[in-house]
């Protein structure tokens, strides 16, 4: 598998999230750099009707895909999110819905749904390359 220069991650602004997600992306998306697009509670935002915020996220993702040729985009939710007080199960549902919203924009990239758990470990929730929803232990 050829190594890509960039991948893209949509994460929370919470400083505990970026490094573990970037490290996971470098390993599992086979890239050198990760463009970070931050938004408070991005899983909740992308799974809701907040159109203007979604449009802004899509604008930034499109920039990363176009100019950095990012072939992989991940949406990540996390434990103890100040902007999204949902429980783990609700976060997982929002991540899956958010990935579906991203798919509707025809970005022509592999989309991943990620969950950063209470121990700071990244879990894969869904992967459009696998063409089916991964079952995550709830």
Residues of each region from the PLM?
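Short, aromatic/basic amphipathic alpha-helical patches
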Residues: 22-26
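Short, small-residue-rich loop/turn micro-motifs
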Residues: 38-40, 77
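Divalent-metal-activated hydrolytic enzyme cores
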Residues: 1-21, 32-33, 40-53, 63-72, ...
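Acidic beta-strand-to-loop metal/phosphate-binding motif
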Residues: 72-78
């Amino acid at each position: 598998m050829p190594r890509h220069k960039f991948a893209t991650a949509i994460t929370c602004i919470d400083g505990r999230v970026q490094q573990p997600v970037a490290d996971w992306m470098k390993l599992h998306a086979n890239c050198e750099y990760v463009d970070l697009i931050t938004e408070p509670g991005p899983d909740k935002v992308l799974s809701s009707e907040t159109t203007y915020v979604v449009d802004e996220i899509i604008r930034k993702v499109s920039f990363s895909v176009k100019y950095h040729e990012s072939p992989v985009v991940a949406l990540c939710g996390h434990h103890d999110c100040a902007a999204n007080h949902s429980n783990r199960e609700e976060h997982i549902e929002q991540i899956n819905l958010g990935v579906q919203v991203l798919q509707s924009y025809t970005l022509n990239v592999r989309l991943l749904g990620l969950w950063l758990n209470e121990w700071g470990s990244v879990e894969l929730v869904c992967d459009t390359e696998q063409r089916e929803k991964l079952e995550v232990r709830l």
